[in-house]
Amino acid sequence: MRNINLLKIYSFLFLIIFPQLSISQNIKEIKKSIIASVENQKNDMIKTSDLIWEAAETSLQEFKSSAYLIDYARKNGFVVKTGVADIETAFTASYGSGRPIIGILGEFDANAGISQKRQPTREARVPGGAGHGCGHNLFGTASLAAAVAIKEQI
């Protein structure tokens, strides 16, 4: 499952970055660089995703989850603005200036009432608690990993 998700990230990044790069660059080198970036982030991505899974915070209450992602963004050289749109847990992570301007959305909120242990059979981690049935623990983490990989290419 994680390898399939990494392949999707690689493909997405290749399509986003390639048009922004000089035609003279070798496509194979670009692809290798993107794959290397995501692979280098793999352990951090899994750890962050797992932390967000365990926190399982519902919309507008994702204080721990937001902090995990903000910390990762800052460690990777992004300037972070918090409290975006007067939402305490919303943030933007920016890098560089000028063009291109690339925006990537990430969500990391959980849904109420769908707590789930990390296993293939139904068993609540916290009975009646929140959980990540929609995979937002992965979505937020993968979006930030994509932003880091793009940053490394531009």
Model-assigned labels for residue ranges:
Residues 25-132, 141-144, 148-154:
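Acidic/His- and Gly-rich active-site-bordering loop/insert found
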